[in-house]
Every structure is written in structure tokens, then in C-alpha cells.
């Protein structure tokens, strides 16, 4: 059965402070399509329009021109049910403290479900589930005060508050910023599981190309307020000409393999995971040993 589009952005434009000396064109003719159940990464340099784009997904910004369709609903209409839309599309922003409203962790995560009018029992179940997804122990953390949390913990609480709404679309702006390596891996694994097992549609903005390679089914590259390139991680990160043209970063594993390839070694340059890249390096080292070659500096 073919998948259906759950997000359709066509020729979207947005200008901040139009008609003033501070006027700034943030989006110009941007296009983006997301199928239900996909995991999509949006990458690009600071100021390329990524954050402005995702704020159109749940009505925080309304389209000035162009089309924004979310789960079949046209957001350019005058009357849009924002409450329903924002239950359907959950956004976790880069600064999580802006999304924390309550003094106690459990109360903050329960805030959204209570606003939906859900009974106490269901709210409690949603809070427990959401906390488990982000790696917060319910009994240990539910009564802690939010002001005393680290930046990484606040990010987890903000994400749990969105997940407790059970959205159809999860939008993440730099999801692992402020997390230590272990917490980062755990959270990425859980996001991937939600996407693959729960069929949750995920759209995320990231400057971390390892995350992009690990999670994304497809990648959109933005520059100067518009989409300039789209493809799978393999298609994006193995096209050296476009990487250079748009100054796209690459996963560290790919950088190492490209360097080995430039030195004349036969390696796969599309090995994104550490394990795959390590296998390629081992092959090179084994060949050097058998041929009594010296390892060159890379």
C-alpha cells in the first residue's frame, strides 16, 4: 500500500519585518514533502531557514505565500483548529526551558494531556510512558523541581511533555544538544524505535551529521531560505561535488574513509556507522600488513 503525504510544503515564502529597514527574507519558494512514517532530516547553515520552516508545521507561523498541508489540512485557510493541529504536530525547540511551564517535572509533562481533558488515570499512564521513552525514571524524577535540572534534563522533560500528547508528527530542533554521549545515543535509539515501531513521523533539524546518517530516511539541505538538495543520507554524503558546493558537513566516519580513498585505498565511502567504518579501516590495515606497507598519516 503506497504511503500518503502527511506534510506538503509547496513554494513557501516568509519575510520577517516586511516593509521595515530590518526586513529579512527567511524562506523563498521552499518545497518539502514528508510521507507518513518517514524520518526526515533538515540540514543547512545557520540562517538558512530551517527553524522558520518547522514553525509553519503547527501554525506558529502562517504561510504568507505558498501552500502548507499538514495531514490533509490546508493551513493557509483563515480558520484552522490550532488546538487539534498542535496535538497532532509536536515541536521540541532548541531551547527546552522555553517549553517548561510547571515547577514539578511530573506536573509539566502532564500539562498538555490535562489540557486535552483526559482523565487522571490516562494522564498518569501517558506521563509514565513518556518519561520512560526519554530515559527519566518516573518514581525518582516525577516530583523533582524543574528549575534545578541541567540543560540536558530540561530537554528530556520538554520532549516527554510533547510525547505525552501522542502526536502523529514529532518535530525536533537539535534534539541532542546538551546531552552527554551516553544520553545522546539512548535518546537517538528511542527516537528511531518510535519511528520504526510506532510509525511516528519524525522531522528533525540537526548540525550533527552522525545523527542525520543514523536516523534519517531522507535529507533536505537548505541554503539561503530554500531547499537546494534532497536525497537519502547515502546520496547526500557520497556526492563530493554537491558536498563542496553547498558546504555540507559529513559524518566523521565518512571523512576518514574519503581520506583513505584519496590516498588510493579501496574502501567503501558510504559506511556511516562506526562499526562499518572500522571494518573498512581494518581491511586497509590488514592489506598493509600483508603487503608490508607503512601506514600513511590521514
Regions found by a protein language model. Name each.
Residues 67-84:
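ABC ATPase NBD Q-loop/coupling interface
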Residues 166:
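Conserved catalytic motifs of ABC-family nucleotide-binding domains
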Residues 224-225:
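Conserved ABC ATPase "signature" C-loop
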Residues 170-173:
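Catalytic Walker B motif of ABC-type/P-loop ATPase nucleotide-binding domains
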Residues 145-149:
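Conserved ABC ATPase signature
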Residues 2-6, 15-29, 78-81:
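A short, flexible loop at the N-terminus of ABC-type nucleotide-binding domains that lies
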Residues 58:
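Helix-to-loop junction immediately C-terminal to a conserved catalytic motif
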Amino acid at each position: 500500500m503506497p504511503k500518503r503525504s502527511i506534510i506538503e510544503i509547496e513554494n513557501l515564502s516568509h519575510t520577517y519585518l516586511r516593509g521595515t529597514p530590518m526586513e529579512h527574507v527567511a524562506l523563498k519558494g521552499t518545497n518539502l514533502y514528508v510521507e507518513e512514517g518517514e524520518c526526515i532530516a533538515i540540514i543547512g547553515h545557520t540562517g538558512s531557514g530551517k527553524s522558520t520552516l518547522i514553525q509553519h508545521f503547527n501554525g506558529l507561523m502562517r504561510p504568507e505565500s505558498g501552500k502548507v498541508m499538514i495531514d490533509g489540512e490546508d493551513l493557509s485557510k483563515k480558520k484552522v483548529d490550532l488546538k487539534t493541529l498542535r496535538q497532532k504536530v509536536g515541536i521540541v525547540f532548541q531551547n527546552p526551558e522555553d517549553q517548561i511551564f510547571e515547577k514539578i517535572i511530573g506536573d509539566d509533562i502532564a500539562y498538555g494531556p490535562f489540557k486535552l481533558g483526559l482523565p487522571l488515570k490516562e494522564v498518569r499512564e501517558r506521563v509514565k510512558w513518556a518519561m520512560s521513552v526519554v530515559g527519566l525514571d518516573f518514581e525518582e524524577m516525577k516530583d523533582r523541581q524543574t528549575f534545578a535540572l541541567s540543560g540536558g534534563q530540561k530537554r528530556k522533560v520538554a520532549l516527554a511533555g510533547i510525547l505525552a500528547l501522542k502526536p502523529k508528527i514529532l518535530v525536533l530542533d537539535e534534539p541532542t544538544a546538551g546531552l552527554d554521549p551516553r544520553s545522546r545515543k539512548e535518546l537517538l535509539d528511542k527516537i528511531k524505535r518510535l519511528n520504526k515501531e510506532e510509525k511516528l513521523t519524525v522531522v528533525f533539524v540537526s548540525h550533527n551529521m552522525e545523527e542525520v546518517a543514523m536516523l534519517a530516511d531522507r535529507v533536505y539541505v537548505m541554503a539561503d531560505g530554500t531547499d537546494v538538495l534532497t536525497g537519502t543520507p547515502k546520496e547526500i554524503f557520497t556526492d563530493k561535488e554537491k558536498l563542496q558546493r553547498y558546504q555540507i558537513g559529513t559524518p566523521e566516519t565518512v571523512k576518514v574513509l574519503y581520506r583513505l580513498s584519496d590516498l588510493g585505498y579501496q574502501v567503501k565511502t558510504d559506511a556511516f556507522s562506526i562499526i562499518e567504518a572500522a571494518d573498512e579501516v581494518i581491511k586497509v590495515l590488514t592489506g598493509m600488513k600483508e603487503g608490508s606497507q607503512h601506514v600513511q598519516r590521514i
